[in-house]
């Protein structure tokens, strides 16, 4: 698929579900990726993988995570999974390498710095596949909340808290904000090319 690697403006979107937010103690339990073009059109969805963990690890999560991951079905998927962190990382890198060269895309998503911290510790090869820059939709959301609350309030996530649904939400959320960005959104009348 070498012809697929031609576009340098492709974006890799990622989301992780974890046992908690402590990057030193908690663990990745699900990963999903999507590749889009620069205009946020989905080109391909990567593997959506629940990562095997013992029941004791899940039971040690805080109440919010236990309830959320049971409700979403992720709890059972993790228990049933045979996929290790190393296998999830290898499958994800293999998928990405079909669509975009290493180092070409920023890491894209919501609160992506947290995901990067977990990847650095548990899937460092995948973390290095991304450019060092981040495209964090949460930054735009925080600015809109402060400067244009009606814009921020105009988008509602599905809040399923599964990795793939969260990736889709992040892309949809950026599409929402893009319509309010004028020339930054590709307004050719303002002399900006797409």
Curated annotation (Swiss-Prot):
CDD domains: Orn
Coiled coil: none
SUPFAM superfamilies the UniProt entry points to: Ribonuclease H-like
Domain Exonuclease: 11-174
Origin: domain of life: Bacteria
InterPro entries: Exonuclease_RNaseT/DNA_pol3 (IPR013520), Oligoribonuclease (IPR022894), RNaseH-like_sf (IPR012337), RNaseH_sf (IPR036397)
Pfam families for this protein: RNase_T
Main location: cytoplasm
Compartments where found: Cytoplasm
Enzyme class: hydrolase
GO cellular component: cytoplasm
Enzyme Commission designation: 3.1.15.-
Keyword Hydrolase among record annotations: yes
Family: Belongs to the oligoribonuclease family.
Main function: 3'-to-5' exoribonuclease specific for small oligoribonucleotides.
The name this protein goes by in its record: Oligoribonuclease
Species this protein is from: Xanthomonas axonopodis pv. citri (strain 306)
Lineage, uppermost ranks: Bacteria, Pseudomonadati, Pseudomonadota, Gammaproteobacteria, Lysobacterales
Gene: orn
